[in-house]
Curated annotation (Swiss-Prot):
Part of the ABC transporter complex GsiABCD involved in glutathione import. Probably responsible for the translocation of the substrate across the membrane. InterPro entries: BP-dependent_transpt_permease, MetI-like, MetI-like_sf, OppC_N. It comes from Escherichia coli O6:H1 (strain CFT073 / ATCC 700928 / UPEC). This is Glutathione transport system permease protein GsiD. The keyword Disulfide bond does not apply. The keyword Lipoprotein does not apply. It is a multi-pass membrane protein. Keywords: Cell inner membrane, Cell membrane, Membrane, Transmembrane, Transmembrane helix, Transport. It is found in: Cell inner membrane. The complex is composed of two ATP-binding proteins (GsiA), two transmembrane proteins (GsiC and GsiD) and a solute-binding protein (GsiB). One of its GO terms (cellular component) is plasma membrane. Residues 101-290 form the ABC transmembrane type-1 domain. The chain crosses the membrane at residues 40-60, 105-125, 144-164, 165-185, 222-242, 266-286.
């Protein structure tokens, strides 16, 4: 017996000790998988830079985006004085693109946030309670899905009136059913799990089960979809502004800038190129970031 105890103690002593900082938490696993994706990391850095620029745009911009006019260089192309050139009114395009990032990004993020908040609530209710709750909410979502998103947004803005605030509301409305269906599907799966039955058996309320057990299980899907939906919302907001239903001149919103550039595209293509490039790169970055988050949060679905 002593020999056995001695051998067991020797084996335990030979085992390497795991230090606290060597324990891999879910966050460490996520970061390890995410940083291996070079495209997603590049997109994340671009998004971080974009957010910083959007926050400090009015301090970074070399000229006033709305009230500066260089009448001696109308429609001139890029130069050392004006990096992105000048538009037909003499305004510095670089300054307007920087400030436009603030407006376009805010419109996209706020619209998706509103849509995600309402859609998540509806999806939880529909998936958990089912019955008439599920039928009512899903039929409303079906009606909203019956219309193309941009047409629905145009109809909402036509009723509410033009302006960036109404654009945010319009884009949020057609984001709601997408989040509702996503969360409903996850809720239907999670509510069948044994840990939900265990929570019910100990007397947990529906609110506790929804907030403490089901909602955390849907967060990863919501985060991924939220990120990718921002790109869609930015395009939608820019499209409405391009049609004259969103931000109004002289507000330097990217879609509104493209609308103003239509008359001068032949003689001064740079007036349209840089706002369009800003929209393209921003949407691409959010989509790549969303793909990276999806693969890092759930590597089983990769490929």
């Amino acid at each position: 017996m002593r020999l056995f105890n001695w051998r067991r103690q020797a084996a335990l002593n030979a085992m390497p000790l795991v230090k606290p900082d060597q324990v891999r938490t879910p966050w460490h696993e996520f970061w390890r998988r995410f940083r291996r994706q070079h495209m997603a990391m590049t997109a994340a850095l671009f998004v971080i830079l974009l957010i910083v620029v959007a926050i400090f745009a009015r301090w970074i911009a070399p000229y006033d985006a709305e009230n500066y006019f260089d009448y001696d260089n109308l429609n001139n192309g890029p130069s050392l004085q004006h990096w992105f050139g000048v538009d037909s009114l003499g305004r510095d395009i670089f300054s307007r693109v920087l400030v436009g990032a603030q407006i376009s990004l805010a419109a996209g993020v706020f619209a998706v946030f509103i849509g995600a908040a309402i859609g998540t609530l509806l999806g939880l209710l529909a998936g958990y309670y089912e019955g008439w709750w599920d039928r009512l909410i899903m039929r409303i979502c079906d009606v909203l899905f019956a219309f193309p998103g941009i047409l629905l947004a145009i109809a909402v803005v036509a009723v509410l009136g033009s302006g960036i605030a109404n654009v945010i509301i319009a884009v949020a409305i057609f984001s709601i059913p997408a989040f509702a269906r996503l969360v409903r599907g996850n809720t239907l799966v999670l509510k069948q799990q044994t840990f939900i039955e265990s929570a019910r058996s100990i007397g947990a309320s529906d609110m506790t089960i929804l907030l403490r057990h089901i909602l955390p299980g849907t967060v990863s899907s919501i985060v991924v979809f939220f990120t990718m939906r921002i790109g869609t919302s930015i395009i939608s907001a820019a499209s409405l502004s391009f049609l004259g239903l969103g931000a109004q001149p002289p507000t330097p919103e990217w879609g509104a800038m493209l609308n103003e550039a239509r008359a001068d595209m032949v003689i001064a293509p740079h007036v349209a190129v840089f706002p369009a490039l800003a929209i393209f790169l921003t949407v691409l970055a959010f989509n790549l970031l969303g793909d990276g988050l999806r693969d890092a949060l759930d590597p089983k679905i990769k490929g």
